[in-house]
Amino acid sequence: MARSLAALLLLLVAAAGASHAASPAEMYWKIALPTSPMPGAIRDLISPASSAASASKDKEDTVGSVFFLEKDLFPGSKMTLHFTRATAGAALLPRGRADSVPFASEKLPEILSQLSIPAGSPTADAMRSTLAVCEAARIASETAPKHKHYCATSLESMVELVASSLGTRDVHAVSTEVVNRAGPTPRQAYRVEAVRPVPVPGGDMVACHRMPYAYAVFGVHGIKGAAYTVTLAGADGTMAEAVAACHGDVDGHGVAVAEAYKRLGVAPGKVAVCHFLPQDDMLWVRN
């Protein structure tokens, strides 16, 4: 399988040279997921100039921090949301390059040296935190297989983790997109214009969350529940096609979700709690 993929990649490289310069990520996607459209979260990493919206330093001021109940998601409902992006400039590395850079806390000085990042800088501190989270998640996944959570440092490793979790490569991904505004969007009221269920066979999904790092790193974990694509109209005319994930498996998904259950007045595991995915995150499901 690996040899056939390599051969196909060489053919695509030759074809790209005759027409346009396709990126390694685009070529890999065409081979690995030929029938699945590339989500905006990946497209924007390939063309970072198109994702120059500002990032929020406050996790409580992002679209992903707003939790609600499934019954409250209907045309005409209103929510105050803030669509933000991860720090600009984080590249999506090809697997070969990503694998050549260590990814371990004990190797952080070497990592910073390879990537020319000053020790003690905000970026270095964020990387230290992400490495610690990824290492803790890996250990927890080994002791509690029900809540597997891994970190992917390349598109190839992400797709393999997703395929392993869902039991097939016949998958596709969806992500949130602000469709008519390239720059930063303010925190404002949005009206729900339309709600469309995402087909989720067996209720099995895999979420991929961008993590703060010098290059694109995703936290990958499985969830069980429902998903929707939601058309949102902002007070200033901003339009968004947002992905909402609704799930009740609060265990292993952090304090924020547990706090959401308290605010919404429901018991953990009894009722699904929903949240929108930030633009940098993705949700994968079987076709």
Curated annotation (Swiss-Prot):
* Assigned keywords, A-Z: Signal
Superkingdom of origin: Eukaryota
SMART domains from the entry? BURP (SM01045)
Signal peptide range equals 1-21
Read off the PROSITE patterns from this record.
BURP
Q: In which tissues is it expressed?
A: Expressed in shoot.
* Record-linked InterPro entries: BURP, BURP_dom
Q: Which Pfam families match?
A: BURP (PF03181)
Q: List each copy of the BURP domain by range.
A: 67-287
Which named protein is this? Answer: BURP domain-containing protein 2
Biological source species: Oryza sativa subsp. japonica (Rice)
Q: Gene behind this chain? A: BURP2
